[in-house]
Amino acid sequence: MKIENILNKGADILKANKIVNPFLDAEILLSESIKKNKKHIILNPTEVLKRQHLNKFNKLIERRKKGEPVAYLINKKEFWKNEFYINKDVLIPRPDSELIIEQVLKIYSKDTQLQVLDVGT
């Protein structure tokens, strides 16, 4: 099956299951399945996937459609320009926390020594 077809099929499954960003999630999961970046997916829509990659993608789509977060499926999440390993034993960094950091950095000078504790917000 071609990249464009499997990507659309995956996005349709996620959309039917009320996943908020179905196409983006499908792209991320496909990228993880074939171990190629998003650019490769966009530039090679007619590339035929190997069965092993298709099977991995389908398994990830099945888990995602049940509501499992993408970060847990791919075991990584970017936060504050860094990539972190994620699994079910840790909380997923949220964009709201990045916003808080940005606001704090606007208020305090770079020379200010801060100590911050974020307890499961």
Please annotate each region the language model reported.
Residues M1-I74:
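N-terminal auxiliary segments of SAM/dcSAM-dependent transferases
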Residues R51-T121:
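SAM-dependent Rossmann-like transferase core, predominantly class I methyltransferases
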